[in-house]
Swiss-Prot record:
Keyword Ribosomal protein: no
Pathway where this protein functions: Amino-acid biosynthesis; L-histidine biosynthesis; L-histidine from 5-phospho-alpha-D-ribose 1-diphosphate: step 3/9
Oligomeric and partner information: Homodimer.
Cofactor note (record): Binds 1 Mg(2+) ion per subunit.
Location relative to the cell: Cytoplasm
Family: Belongs to the PRA-CH family.
Name recorded for this polypeptide: Phosphoribosyl-AMP cyclohydrolase
EC numbers for this chain: 3.5.4.19
Length: 132
């Protein structure tokens, strides 16, 4: 006889789902960060099912906006992301996924999707008078 799967195993916990503020496509931004160095590795998107899979498996699963399908980081490349912690931001519209990244995180082969992509920015200093 096959094992019985509870409805809770098939859905994201109601306590978590109620706290998420999704965009019009039902997605939440997921910032992925190396757990020990705090290096920002990439940004992906998750719906409830991608988050449920991530929390249950310990490997990061995203929802591809362009392909409209789930993908688990590293299944093709071998560059897996092992989950260390997941946090929800104060507004409930973004996740911070702390991982142990094995190999490059970016599909271009770089460690981070943000490597060498700094935009030129200049902010002029502003003097603020101290309050007496």
């Amino acid at each position: 006889m096959p094992a019985q799967i509870s409805s809770e195993d098939q859905q994201l916990s109601t306590k978590i789902a109620e706290r998420l503020k999704r965009d019009e496509a039902g997605l939440v931004a997921a910032v992925v960060q190396q757990f020990d160095s705090k290096e920002v590795l990439m940004l992906g998107w998750m719906d409830d099912e991608a988050l449920r899979r991530t929390l249950r498996s310990g490997r990061v699963t995203f929802f591809s906006r362009s392909r409209q399908e789930y993908w688990r980081k590293g299944d093709t490349s071998g560059h897996i992301q092992m989950v260390k912690a997941v946090a929800l931001d104060c507004d409930g519209d973004a996740l911070l996924i702390s991982v142990d990244q094995h190999g490059p995180a970016c599909h271009t082969g770089t460690r981070s999707c943000f490597d060498g992509r700094a935009l030129p920015a200049f902010v002029e200093p502003v003097f603020v008078e101290p309050v007496a």
